[in-house]
Amino acid sequence: MAARRLFVAFALLCGLAWGPEGASADDRAIVLATTTSTQESGLLDHLLPIFRDKTGIDVKVIARRADEVLDGARKGEADVVLIHARPQEEKFVADGFAAKRFDVMYNDYVLIGPKSDPAAVKGKDIATALKAIEGKGAPFVTRGDRSGTHAAELALWIVAGIDIASAKGAWYREVKQGMDAALEAARTANAYVLSDRGSWISFRDRGELDIVVEGDKRLLNQYGVMLMNPEKFPNVKKELGQTFVDWLISPEGQAAIAGYKVDGQQLFFPNADKSAG
């Protein structure tokens, strides 16, 4: 009889550990690979509990630079990828690592600079502003870390007609770190820096920094979501991952994105196109 009670207790413990139908907690979890700026914005802390309450699916987040996100995903380290580096995303799909990408939301980049504005760029378009900064040799902080934001910045220098790779002088300063570190470096050096708006809104110790350029259409920062290709990665949790993708681009998920605010300001703007690829 005692042995039977022990067996029943053991079975109950197994049931608690594995849940219904023998499924472990990990079987109801997916891995989402995303960028550090997305994680630091606080958006996922807002979205993921809503998704878990709706579906019972846990989402484990890996936050890295955009290039590291894709490198890890190519090794099968994620079920779903959420980043903001569209050219790289489209190549990722073309190479067969994901079957499709979907627009999810956007925010924008802003050029941050000292309130004293030594390069006199406030209110200019982004190309004119960057030309003025380079011409003046005004201090500019770059993340220099191969992130999505760094890639966007490099593309903007090209738009401005400046070969930033051969830039001379101490005015162009690499931090090789994330957005918060770059903003802090700009604050300390009284320098210009390109930031996604969400990171700027969340950055508290601004000192003498302020937005000097915004609203240029070339500063759009589009986010895409991709389910890893189960034909290439058999261990991908296809059904659970697809459930997350479907929820993000659904009216409910889009409303949750729109509902995330910091200090009363909306950080991300949903724009899912379910037919996009």
Feature map (PLM): residue ranges:
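Residue-level signal for tight coil/turn positions that link beta-strands
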Residues: Y106-D108, G137
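Bacterial N-terminal signal peptides
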Residues: V8-W18
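Serine endopeptidase catalytic core focused on the charge-relay Asp
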Residues: L111
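Short, charge-rich binding segments
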Residues: A23, R101-V104, A132-I133
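Boundary at the C-terminal end of the N-terminal hydrophobic targeting segment
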Residues: G19-A25
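Acidic, polar ligand-binding/catalytic clefts
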Residues: V80-Y106
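N-terminal secretory signal peptides that target proteins for export/translocation
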Residues: M1-A3
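Exported/periplasmic ABC-transporter solute-binding proteins
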Residues: A25-D58, I62, D67, D71-E77, ...
